[in-house]
Amino acid sequence: MKTTIVLVLAFSAIAATPAQAQLGGLSDRLKQAQEAKAKVDKFDLRISEADERKLGEEVSQRLCQEFGVYQNKEVARYVALVGRVLAQESSRPGLDWQFIVLDTDGVNAFASPGGFVHITRGALGLVRNEAELAGVLGHEITHITAKHTVRAIQKSKVVSLGASEVGSSGGLAQSVVSRLAEAAYSNIINNKFDRNDEVESDKVGIGLANKAGYAPGALSDVLKRLEDRNKNQEQPNGMFASHPLITDRLENIAKIIKDDKLTASGRVGTRYTKFITFEAKPLSEVPVIAGARGLTGGDSKDSKDAKATEKKAEPKKKGGLLGKVGLTSGSQAQNTQTVASAGARGLGQPDRDAKGGTNPNKVDMTVTAAEVAEFKKGIA
């Protein structure tokens, strides 16, 4: 396993010299600095599949801690079966895929590197049939198979490594994985993937749904419902809040279905409503928390205080949500303060900042290949 290390370059100050000599020395040093920077720009942070898994597991734990895990085993198994049907059609079927239902009324979904897909209880309530669920899960699966979060981290170079931070087996040290997880969590929770990443996830995701027998256009139905849900919101909110605009995505999905001749027609509404017996709450009824979720990995003082006092007072609204791999304008502390202040003014986005449950433990269950094969027979 090879790991390329991003070098952190430091240049000493120029000692006092005669003017002419100093100018010459400055010119030489400037040239050296330019050459060194060009060399550094060629370096990349290599994240192995094992490192990706560790990274994704840590991010998943943070999501479960932040939102809680819905403890209904039948619902958890059902979502996992739909997800596994899609995952086996993907370019990375061998990943140890996990599909987790988060215990929050907010309508959202998150893809964590290495095979961890999360969908909220609120999102399940918004979806109307299995094909729509497949469209959502297929989109999130593609973020993972295409390594969108991993590549965003690599491009941003938010973490610089020293030789001591490479593990004894050649992988990344745990301290580095934790730093990467902080950046990845911010990227995921704030839901601002690159435009091309979103287009790819829509295209490949509906392709996976089609291969499994689900109607690919079902994702468009979810998007339309989301558009109506958020029509009075000033900013993008919750699931699929990233650009491009929903109207553009709808047009693109229709074009993909036509050009790629995607003709599957399975909707599977009856089986869906057998397991998902609840509906999404209107935005006005979704409780939100105070704090700066996403800017500090969900562990800000405001967030902790809100959780500690949420039973004593009505939760305050807050801002927050995705930025590109944790990169923000200004210092993190400044951004945290700004978001918290916005929350104090009553500015918040319910789906994005929804209060979660208190149990972070994942539902203990196993889904076998035979169960997946049998489940797939019901797609019609």
Language-model regions, residue ranges each:
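Positively charged n-region of N-terminal signal peptides that target proteins for export
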Residues: M1-T4
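Bacterial N-terminal signal peptides
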Residues: V6-A15
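A Zn2+-metalloprotease active-site environment signal
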Residues: P18-A380
